[in-house]
Amino acid sequence: MPIMGSSVYITVELAIAVLAILGNVLVCWAVWLNSNLQNVTNYFVVSLAAADIAVGVLAIPFAITISTGFCAACHGCLFIACFVLVLTQSSIFSLLAIAIDRYIAIRIPLRYNGLVTGTRAKGIIAICWVLSFAIGLTPMLGWNNCGQPKEGKNHSQGCGEGQVACLFEDVVPMNYMVYFNFFACVLVPLLLMLGVYLRIFLAARRQLKQMESQPLPGERARSTLQKEVHAAKSLAIIVGLFALCWLPLHIINCFTFFCPDCSHAPLWLMYLAIVLSHTNSVVNPFIYAYRIREFRQTFRKIIRSHVLRQQEPFKAAGTSARVLAAHGSDGEQVSLRLNGHPPGVWANGSAPHPERRPNGYALGLVSGGSAQESQGNTGLPDVELLSHELKGVCPEPPGLDDPLAQDGAGVS
């Protein structure tokens, strides 16, 4: 590869690596910080983000290294060449798990919480990663070209005894890449996801038509279903972008394998396809920010607080706080639940005591909608609520607003 072309390739790859790391760390940070985003679907989103972070930290540096054709032991070269296949497979499994999760949520919503639990999701994620390593590192178990070293190329690179010129196609057999990796482990899951999302949209369309035919359709049920469909569209876009980024490289591999007499793809085209495949690790955070309001708002808060160092004023509304009114015989009790703080506990470990106001209102932190009473009133600063602000308050019960951002979150 010419020095100029090599420099451009390395520069672009490094830029992609930085963006992939920063964007996907932001995704994981948002889920960790915002309790509204801590749901089963987003466990799989975090697994997908972890694979994309690993692409930026490891796979892209490995790809840059292997592009130089440096001399190495064959199995060491194999590990470097195959590691990106592990991460690709993990991404595919995460996308498939998300598609199935959304299918269950729309097809059998009443059984969703019983079937799809956090413990099961974490177990599925662990299994997906184990399978990804097994599939991606299969060439190291013997399905490789280490037994047929290309002596001429090795000598031209100045490689010593027992070393090979570390180039992807020289160590990884193309029949593995086409038959096993592409046809079995990439194309089949992509087709399954296509079928699952098609069924999701058909089922949602049928349910919406049934609601329209009812004399008094439930607006809340209709709104929830529409938001499920919106989330499914967002995730289907992510699957489509994955296919768009990875299929060109696999198509080039198919031409190389099925037409050995044809001229090999130009080197610039190969590197363009490789860069496109790595770009997939950058795009997902932008999709979340553009399509999902709760992610977008949390990204803004993280950037303002931790990057720009701007202090945001306290707001007792929106996604960071919720006011719940409980009506009693001796007045009204207003409780404030804050995201990011343990409900009903001060920072020093003591529980708050709701203070009785002269106007008959009490203020306290709640857990699950009930006030927590205890001795002591130190810790978080008091919050003043005026009685006229509470007149006519009639909050909706907490419920699903978006499957990717539950408990009060929303989508745009």
Curated annotation (Swiss-Prot):
Ubiquitinated. Deubiquitinated by USP4; leading to stabilization and expression at the cell surface. Its main location: membrane. GO terms for biological process: adenylate cyclase-activating G protein-coupled receptor signaling pathway; adenylate cyclase-modulating G protein-coupled receptor signaling pathway; apoptotic process; apoptotic signaling pathway; astrocyte activation; blood circulation; blood coagulation; cell-cell signaling. The keyword Disulfide bond applies. Disulfide bonds join C71-C159, C74-C146, C77-C166, C259-C262. One of its GO terms (cellular component) is membrane. Keywords: Cell membrane, Disulfide bond, G-protein coupled receptor, Glycoprotein, Membrane, Receptor, Transducer, Transmembrane, Transmembrane helix, Ubl conjugation. Residues 391-412 are annotated as: Disordered. It is found in: Cell membrane. The chain crosses the membrane at residues 8-32, 43-66, 78-100, 121-143, 174-198, 235-258, 267-290. It comes from the Eukaryota. Residues 33-42, 101-120, 199-234, 291-412 are cytoplasmic. It is a multi-pass membrane protein. Belongs to the G-protein coupled receptor 1 family. PANTHER family: ADENOSINE RECEPTOR A2A, OLFACTORY RECEPTOR AND ADENOSINE RECEPTOR. Interacts (via cytoplasmic C-terminal domain) with USP4; the interaction is direct. May interact with DRD4. Interacts with NECAB2. Interacts (via cytoplasmic C-terminal domain) with GAS2L2; interaction enhances receptor-mediated adenylyl cyclase activity. This is Adenosine receptor A2a.
